[in-house]
Swiss-Prot record:
Additional notes on this entry: The basic functional RuBisCO is composed of a large chain homodimer in a 'head-to-tail' conformation. In form I RuBisCO this homodimer is arranged in a barrel-like tetramer with the small subunits forming a tetrameric 'cap' on each end of the 'barrel'.
Organism: Physcomitrium patens
Official protein name in the record: Ribulose bisphosphate carboxylase large chain
Modified residues (N-acetylproline): 3
Binding-site positions, Mg(2+): 201, 203-204
Catalytic activity field: 2 (2R)-3-phosphoglycerate + 2 H(+) = D-ribulose 1,5-bisphosphate + CO2 + H2O; D-ribulose 1,5-bisphosphate + O2 = 2-phosphoglycolate + (2R)-3-phosphoglycerate + 2 H(+)
GO biological process assignments: photorespiration; reductive pentose-phosphate cycle
Subunit annotation: Heterohexadecamer of 8 large chains and 8 small chains; disulfide-linked. The disulfide link is formed within the large subunit homodimers.
Family, per entry: Belongs to the RuBisCO large chain family. Type I subfamily.
Active-site residues annotated for this sequence: 175, 294
Subcellular location: Plastid, Chloroplast
Name of the gene: rbcL
Propeptide residues according to the Swiss-Prot or TrEMBL record: 1-2
Length: 475
């Protein structure tokens, strides 16, 4: 029997485990214009250095693994690895740090939010050396954003399609969200649109349930839209929720909406998934449909201050994946949203170029180049008394959506819509005349209520309604 040959390790390979920071913590690194940059809020386990944690985040979300492997020598890790290039303590928080990580562009598939998130917010969030990890912000370079279609149409094209300018758009979510028959649902849509709203909306829960199948809902809503358009002379729409159990079924529903001549469909982009959402966005551009996006499930990901990801990251991801509207909080209503933070990601949705501004939670300057903008939708616990503040906070390029604030009117749905339209027109006129909506808002609403009995009734019903809780999402 011949002697067993001696196997020698290669010169460049040394088996074993080594600290991540030896390879992935590079404080001298100069970021490139093509790098994707990430800001992570880290809470290390006791005794683990911040530099090791930051390097671990960079490693585990790019080329690293827990031990040295032979195949490291078959590629250029220096070209492909993520790099933790800066770490700073979080003011006022014990044992929390912001780690800045740069990723080379070649790590990510073009035009795929799914692939981007699989790397950056993947397994690393379960890493044992970290007690908690939150992705606060991403810088998407133009070299990557140009590989995405983005929103199907964008703000200006939507205004041109609707022939509506110089004011926020008005919407209403049909309530109760579940349980109505298709015919009664269509009746509520008609009454709201006839009263002066621009849009009505399927609730995010409404897909195709036994009490109301999707095709029946689409047909009765189409009838309501055509009837209200004929009576008002305005273009109307209803967000027909195309979200379904499969991508094929989702596209089938969008096709039916197009065949009915409807202007807009809707998708729950987080529960539906980014691959489905991007597919629907491409279909909508090709077929002239606007796309309304609901963010159901977002608070599971973004509500905790030290773990998960901030909504500004989800907002940027949506702009890449595609959507013409997205729910963004209200600042003044029943749902979470601190003013400066909300306005920060609203600008990230709408504007082409947004400067770094840590006072608004914006960690990086973001240049979207020519990617179309997204209209923020303020929705949740708002009513006519909020109209001056909403108009002042969100400006013209927004959708103000009153569900209970329309359908809860004591005289019915159409008077509720009238009250909201009158309040909005009064606020826009007052603003255009140079009045201060923040200071004179209540007076402006009272003046308008003198000649609108519908608005006067709404003011009386909701005069005591407030949602006074401290926001969790603070800087």
């Amino acid at each position: 029997m011949s002697p067993r040959p001696e196997i020698k390790a290669g010169v460049g390979f040394k088996a074993g485990v080594k600290d991540y920071r030896l390879t992935y913590y590079t404080p001298d690194y100069q970021t490139k214009d093509t790098d994707i940059l990430a800001a992570f809020r880290m809470t290390p386990q006791p005794g683990v250095p911040a530099e090791e944690c930051g390097a671990a985040v960079a490693a585990e979300s790019s080329t690293g693994t827990w031990t040295t492997v032979w195949t490291d020598g078959l590629t250029s890790l220096d070209r492909y690895k993520g790099r933790c290039y800066a770490i700073e303590p979080v003011a006022g928080e014990e044992n929390q740090y912001i780690a800045y990580v740069a990723y080379p562009l070649d790590l990510f598939e073009e035009g795929s939010v799914t692939n981007l998130f699989t790397s950056i917010v993947g397994n690393v969030f379960g890493f044992k050396a970290l007690r908690a990890l939150r992705l606060e912000d991403l810088r998407i370079p133009p070299a990557y954003s140009k590989t995405f279609q983005g929103p199907p149409h964008g703000i200006q094209v939507e205004r041109d399609k609707l022939n509506k300018y110089g004011r926020p758009l008005l919407g209403c979510t049909i309530k109760p969200k579940l349980g109505l028959s298709a015919k009664n649902y269509g009746r509520a849509v008609y009454e709201c649109l006839r009263g002066g709203l621009d849009f009505t909306k399927d609730d995010e829960n409404v897909n195709s349930q036994p009490f109301m199948r999707w095709r029946d809902r689409f047909l009765f809503c189409a009838e309501a839209i055509y009837k209200s358009q004929g009576e008002t002379g305005e273009i109307k729409g209803h967000y027909l929720n195309a979200t379904a159990g499969t991508c094929e079924e989702m596209i089938k529903r969008a096709q039916f909406a197009r065949e009915l001549g409807m202007p807009i469909v809707m998708h729950d982009y987080l529960t539906g998934g980014f691959t489905a959402n991007t597919s629907l966005a491409h279909y909508c551009r090709d077929n002239g449909l606007l796309l309304h996006i609901h963010r159901a499930m977002h608070a599971v990901l973004d509500r905790q201050k030290n773990h998960g990801m901030h909504f500004r990251v989800l907002a940027k991801a949506l702009r890449l994946s595609g959507g013409d509207h997205i729910h963004s909080g209200t600042v003044v209503g029943k749902l979470e949203g601190e003013r400066q933070v909300t306005l920060g990601f609203v600008d990230l949705l709408r504007d082409d170029y947004i400067e770094k501004d840590r006072s608004r939670g914006i960690y990086f300057t973001q240049d979207w180049v020519s990617l179309p903008g997204v209209l923020p939708v303020a929705s949740g616990g708002i009513h006519v008394w909020h109209m001056p503040a909403l108009t002042e906070i969100f400006g013209d390029d927004s959708v103000l959506q009153f569900g209970g604030g329309t359908l809860g009117h004591p005289w019915g749905n159409a008077p509720g819509a009238v009250a909201n339209r009158v309040a909005l027109e009064a606020c826009v006129q007052a603003r255009n005349e140079g009045r201060d909506l923040a200071r004179e808002g209540n007076e402006i609403i009272r003046e308008a209520a003198k000649w609108s009995p519908e608005l006067a009734a709404a003011c009386e019903v909701w005069k005591e309604i407030k949602f006074e809780f401290d926001t969790v999402d603070t800087l």
